[in-house]
């Protein structure tokens, strides 16, 4: 068998080579088998054992449709030092479930899983991988469906290929950290890039929706790339982690697909180099200096307009860690679990600048445990390419579940779109017109020498 460092498993023919227990294949996806029209409550799928080039790191991805009351759990094991490890779980997963990564290790501590990455410290590295996915439901009328499984390893002796030169530029929306939710800090870079990759295909999803749909509850961060790929899969996009060389990147751009790439570089305010995510949107050649360059979207730029940047190819290959996330166009037949958007109205409260959500005439107040993002965007008369390009101004939650607008907006008045994304990625959306304050009446009190108002006194 040819050894490849990136494996992507999808489709009926590929999945049928593994072992299905209480599962069936339906429209190319793994689903729970059924008896008399009722789904079984539990089932599992185990892939064949795959030989891999000796590796030090392993990343696993999955794309699944998991309706309410269903769950997916992906596990892996590694062949190293002449034996297979025990199964290691990446945590139970569903769009509406509080996702938490799990840490585990082998008995000798030489192979361990932390977050989204399995590290093999054993001499000679790992040489084999096997995946397993467990499906479960608490409702025999619904079943989860797994559409894609992927495994990517970083070889110990990686002979990186360059491929053929390519001159192609792709459109990729520009989003920067400073214009979006600051709750996650610099780690908001990955949700920004993932939103851009999907919005390139017309999704129009907010980075904040992506962030809360992929948040790792164990670290309260958005740095888990397995959850990032799963979040994109929820929206119907085939998406997986990969360890790529220049040939792989050029093939993705050649096929018209932008890629999320991890680079190591210095950023403002950081003493040591940090790893951050950028969007790769093309390659080019500068005839003036006879050099190749890459086209990137850097979310750490100061403004949306400064996100597009270029970098010499030799510099990019020095900073590129090899870790990437590939995303392909949405398939029409794929069921989607994209974060819910609830169309609401806003009702003015008794306190100045406080409004309350209503849905279909019923109160839809923000719950006490709300820990998401609330913002509003003014209607500025500009046709923005995506909703995420609008200018967002932060609002706050009141103690009784309302939305408090900042004083400067109340002073300006006008029409606004209001967004409240909760910790599951579900978003309330409403429109409101803030009344413009009445101008202060001109003073009519008599002044010196019989003058009134603001007219100057005559000498």
Where are the model-predicted features located?
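Beta-strand-rich ligand- or partner-binding modules
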Residues: 1-169
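Noncatalytic regulatory segments and standalone regulatory/sensor domains
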Residues: 5-19, 24, 50-53, 124-139, ...
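Surface-exposed, short loops/turns at beta-strand junctions within beta-sandwich domains
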Residues: 121-126, 407-413
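Recognizes extended acidic, P/S/T-rich segments that occur
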Residues: 105-110, 371-410
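Extracellular fibronectin type III
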Residues: 425-436
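Active-site-adjacent structural segments surrounding the nucleophilic cysteine of cysteine proteases
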Residues: 134-220, 354-359, 385-391, 396-401, ...
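Conserved active-site-adjacent core of cysteine acyl-enzyme catalytic domains
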Residues: 38, 209-333, 399
């Amino acid at each position: 068998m040819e050894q490849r460092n990136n494996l992507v498993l999808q489709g009926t023919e590929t999945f049928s080579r593994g072992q299905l227990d209480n599962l069936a294949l339906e429209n190319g996806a793994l689903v729970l088998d059924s008896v008399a029209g009722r789904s079984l409550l539990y089932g599992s799928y185990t892939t064949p054992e795959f030989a891999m080039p000796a590796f030090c790191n392993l990343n696993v991805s999955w794309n699944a449709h998991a309706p309410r009351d269903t769950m997916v759990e992906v596990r892996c094991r590694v062949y190293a030092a002449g034996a297979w490890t025990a199964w290691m779980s990446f945590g139970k997963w569903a769009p509406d479930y509080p996702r938490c990564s799990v840490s585990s290790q082998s008995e000798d501590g030489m192979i361990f899983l932390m977050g989204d990455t399995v590290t093999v410290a054993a001499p000679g590295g790992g040489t084999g991988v096997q995946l397993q996915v467990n499906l479960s439901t608490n409702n025999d009328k619904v079943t989860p469906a797994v559409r894609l499984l992927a495994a990517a390893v970083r070889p110990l002796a990686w002979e990186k290929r360059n491929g053929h030169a390519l001159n192609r530029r792709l459109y990729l929306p520009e989003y920067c950290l400073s214009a979006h939710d600051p709750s996650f800090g610099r780690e908001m870079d990955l949700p920004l890039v993932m939103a851009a990759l999907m919005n390139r295909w017309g999704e129009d999803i907010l980075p904040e929706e992506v962030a809360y749909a992929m948040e790792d509850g164990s670290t309260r961060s958005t740095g888990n790339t397995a959850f990032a790929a799963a979040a994109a899969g929820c929206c119907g996009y085939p998406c997986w982690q990969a360890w790529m060389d220049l040939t792989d990147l050029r093939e993705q751009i050649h096929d018209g697909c932008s890629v999320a790439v991890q680079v190591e570089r210095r950023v403002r305010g950081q003493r040591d180099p940090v790893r951050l995510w950028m969007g790769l949107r093309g390659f080019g050649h500068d005839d003036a200096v006879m050099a190749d360059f890459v086209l990137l979207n850097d979310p750490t730029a100061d403004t949306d307009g400064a996100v597009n940047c270029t970098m010499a190819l030799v510099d990019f290959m020095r900073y590129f860690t090899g870790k990437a996330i590939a995303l392909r166009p949405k398939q029409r037949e794929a069921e989607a679990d994209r974060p819910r958007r609830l169309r609401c109205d806003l009702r003015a409260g008794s306190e100045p600048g406080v409004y309350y959500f209503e849905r279909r005439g019923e109160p839809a107040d923000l719950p006490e445990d709300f820990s998401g993002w609330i913002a509003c965007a003014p209607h500025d008369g500009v046709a923005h390419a995506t909703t995420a390009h609008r200018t967002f101004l932060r609002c706050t939650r009141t103690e009784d579940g309302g939305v408090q607008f900042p004083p400067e907006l109340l002073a300006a008045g006008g029409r606004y779109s209001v967004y409240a994304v909760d910790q599951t990625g579900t978003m309330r959306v409403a429109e409101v017109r803030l009344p413009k304050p009445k101008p202060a009446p001109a003073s009519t009190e008599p002044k010196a020498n019989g003058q009134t108002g603001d007219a100057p006194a005559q000498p």
